């Protein structure tokens, strides 16, 4: 019996991004001429009894003490929420902002808490693409562009 090898699809993924949202956010920052890095550094943090690393999705250098970090999220899993609370506790000066596909999604099937409400309760800035039809609020874009003038 003759065996056939499976051919690889000519449409294999060529993007370096983990999601379409990350790719589109990358294109948005590029179009706005905002300097940024994509998953280009790691932040060490401790989970109880375990050293871990966090790689931010996008980071925009600024002339401020810290860069602005953007986490793009379609789904906001419990593990992500726990991780970001630990990082916020260990690095309170980091400016981590969430960019959600839809911040009105609930954090769980039985929960009444939305992604937006969770961010408000935990002190994180966030933005909703779905409700604004924008990747970032104009104020954030201006803030970053102003802080990158001298870089």
Report residues per predicted region.
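Active-site metal-binding core of divalent-cation-utilizing nuclease and nuclease-like domains
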Residues: 6-18, 28-66, 72-81, 88-89, ...
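Conserved alpha-helical elements of sugar-nucleotide-dependent glycosyltransferases
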Residues: 17-24, 83, 111
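Detector for Asparagine
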Residues: 26-27, 59, 63, 102-105, ...
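Conserved beta-strand termini and adjacent loop/short-helix elements that scaffold enzyme active sites
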Residues: 39-41, 99-101, 129-132
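A short acidic, often aromatic-flanked loop/helix-cap motif at beta-alpha or helix-coil junctions
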Residues: 44-46, 105-106, 131-138
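Catalytic cores of nucleic-acid endonucleases
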Residues: 74-126
């Amino acid at each position: 019996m003759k065996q056939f090898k499976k051919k690889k699809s000519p449409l294999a993924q060529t993007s370096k991004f983990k999601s379409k949202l990350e790719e589109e956010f990358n294109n948005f920052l590029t179009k706005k001429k905002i300097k940024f890095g994509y998953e280009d550094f790691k932040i060490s943090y401790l989970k109880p009894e375990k050293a871990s690393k966090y790689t931010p999705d996008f980071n925009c250098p600024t002339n401020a003490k810290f860069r602005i970090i953007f986490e793009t999220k379609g789904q906001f899993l419990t593990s992500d929420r726990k991780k970001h609370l630990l990082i916020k506790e260990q690095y309170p000066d980091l400016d981590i902002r969430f960019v959600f596909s839809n911040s009105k999604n609930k954090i769980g099937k039985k929960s009444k808490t939305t992604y937006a409400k969770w961010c408000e309760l935990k002190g994180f800035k966030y933005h909703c693409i779905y409700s604004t039809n924008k990747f970032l609020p104009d104020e954030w874009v201006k803030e970053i562009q102003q802080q990158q003038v001298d870089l």
